[in-house]
Design a protein with these regions (language model features):
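Hydrophobic alpha-helical transmembrane segments
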Residues: 1-30, 35-44, 51, 55-342
Length: 342
């Protein structure tokens, strides 16, 4: 399936077709071999177990393959070869780590193909810019590693997510997820004995927000950017509610003070991002944002209250709550899209 798909999209470009397959054949195989027989430092991704040694083997093999492949089969400059190989090796290593159930066999080669299409013939200056974006995001995540509830694997995935957002949409689209990543720990209530949030939860949030960036390629960019900000704002408000409810003993009762606090933080998140980043003055959509933030947060709280009335002794995991949140956010984002299309 992967080989057929690459053959269909590569349009007889030998580099675009061959390199993804070679990386899949050798990097993935060496990583699996090293991880199986020589690994000492293993970590749980939320979908299974990977090893630091296996990831390092994947990175080094990919880098070696890319350097030599470009030297022999491309006409790009030496500095460009190093930069493209380095960026591609880092990103595919992260993608391999966060893939599950063998889907790296699909994700990695198609990502390599897309990366080559977008980056192979960029100038040295453009590649250096992308490299420094990667370095800066990496430094931010390292400095913030103790001020987050994410597992280390999820933090690594957030680097991949933020980088892709930056490259596809630019700084404008990067700011909302970066503010959320850096701010939620400090602005939302602290939780005693906080269980680390998994990769699965991060992927759910990433999907329900980044889909609007993907759609902006073919639809109204300004309106979709407003929906993009809205989706992060609603996520932020519900996360505030989740963290506040973690210490709530009376789970079956509504607490209007805290509900309004979460709504206020969601609206503040939206207003700050909208004023700084979005110039849209579609008052119909802006009114819809206010109404739908109220509706989304009350919907989440109502779902939780009904659950706790029915299941008095059971507690939902944080991961499950994030899945529910992502579903609610996506639903209300679709409603806002409908308002924008009227």
């Amino acid at each position: 399936m992967t080989i057929l798909g690459l053959w269909l999209v590569s349009s007889d470009n030998k580099v675009m077709y061959t390199l993804p397959i070679i990386i899949l054949m050798f990097s993935d195989a060496f990583a699996a071999l090293i991880g199986e027989f020589y690994s000492k430092y293993k970590f749980n991704t939320g979908f299974g177990t990977k090893s630091i040694e296996g990831s390092a083997a994947f990175f080094l093999t990919t880098y070696f393959i890319c350097i030599n492949f470009f030297l022999f089969f491309s006409d790009i400059g030496n500095i460009n070869i190093v930069l493209v190989s380095l960026l591609l090796s880092i990103l595919t290593m992260i993608l391999e780590v966060i893939s599950w159930n063998g889907l790296d066999n699909l994700f990695v080669p198609f990502f390599v193909y897309m990366f080559l299409r977008l980056n192979l013939y960029l100038t040295e200056k453009e590649l250096m810019y992308k490299f420094w974006v990667m370095v800066i995001l990496f430094v931010i995540i390292i400095l913030n590693r103790k001020k987050t509830t994410l597992t280390r694997t999820a933090q690594t995935a957030s680097l991949f997510f933020l980088y892709i957002i930056m490259i596809m949409g630019g700084i404008k689209w990067l700011v909302p997820p970066l503010i959320m990543y850096l701010g939620y720990y400090h602005i939302t209530p602290k939780v005693e004995g906080q269980v680390k949030d998994s990769l699965k939860g991060l992927l759910a949030i990433a999907f329900t927000t980044s889909i609007w960036l993907a759609l902006s390629i073919v639809m109204d960019k300004d309106k979709l950017f407003l929906i993009y900000i809205f989706s992060f704002s609603l996520h932020f408000g519900i996360i505030n509610l989740i963290r506040d409810n973690a210490g709530n003993i009376n789970r079956e009762t509504f607490r209007m003070k805290f509900l309004m606090g979460s709504i206020g933080k969601a609206l503040m998140f939206f207003i700050i991002n909208h004023i700084i980043l979005s110039g849209i003055t579609d008052f119909k959509m802006l009114e819809g944002v206010i109404v739908l933030i109220f509706g989304g947060i009350f919907t989440y709280e109502t779902v939780m209250k009904i659950y706790y009335i029915v299941e008095k002794e059971k507690e939902l995991s944080g991961e499950t709550k994030v899945f529910i949140t992502s579903g609610i956010v996506f639903f209300y984002s679709l409603l806002l899209l409908g308002i924008g299309m009227l």
